Amino acid sequence: MLPDIGGTELLIIAAVALIVVGPKDLPALLRKVGQFVGRMRGMASEFRASFDEMARQSELDELRREVQAMRSGQFTNPVQDAADAARDVQVDQVFADIDASLSSGAMQAHPYAAGETHNSILPTAEPSAEIVEAKPKRAPRKKAVAEPVAAEPVLVEPVKAPRKRASQKQEITVEAPKAVRAPRKRASKAGDSTASDIVS
């Protein structure tokens, strides 16, 4: 709450207030201090709210002026200004030249592409083929066939039955619960009285 006041300072202030005011009037004083702090916070929030309202009002006034300027035609749209600048005569001339060259059918090759096709100064290398002998493939391995040994006994596992499907009906049996005795009561401690101890 108060970053400049630590725990020891608060204890000292509380001790001084207890000595000066006394234990009898201290609760009333703390109540009045709490009310004063509440009023100060209320005034601060009211000031903040009025300040925010003035800021909103100034923004609304500015927006109203812009809307009035747009209605009267004085407001210039930045997108429209850029479009008007692009309609320059030189830009139109460049586009007209491009359209004329495309429609005439006379196409010029790219200067670098033309140099590659008509370059007779550089010697051309004749393609040469090297003969490489192919390695023979390995023969596939033969699978080893196990010979049955008659002397050793062979363990044969029984074949499991296939699982039943969920769609088949299964009989469900429900057993009745067995009766369970209640736990015995503990013996009472010495000095405790129970209903059986009282004799009328």
From Swiss-Prot:
InterPro entries: TatA/B/E, TatB. It is a single-pass membrane protein. The keyword Transmembrane applies. GO terms for cellular component: TAT protein transport complex. Residues 160-200 are annotated as: Disordered. It is found in: Cell inner membrane. Coiled coil: none annotated. One of its GO terms (molecular function) is protein transmembrane transporter activity. The chain crosses the membrane at residues 2-22. Residues 191-200 have a biased composition (Polar residues). Disulfide bonds: none annotated. Keywords: Cell inner membrane, Cell membrane, Membrane, Protein transport, Translocation, Transmembrane, Transmembrane helix, Transport. GO terms for biological process: protein transport by the Tat complex. Part of the twin-arginine translocation (Tat) system that transports large folded proteins containing a characteristic twin-arginine motif in their signal peptide across membranes. Together with TatC, TatB is part of a receptor directly interacting with Tat signal peptides. TatB may form an oligomeric binding site that transiently accommodates folded Tat precursor proteins before their translocation. Belongs to the TatB family. The Tat system comprises two distinct complexes: a TatABC complex, containing multiple copies of TatA, TatB and TatC subunits, and a separate TatA complex, containing only TatA subunits. Substrates initially bind to the TatABC complex, which probably triggers association of the separate TatA complex to form the active translocon. This is Sec-independent protein translocase protein TatB.
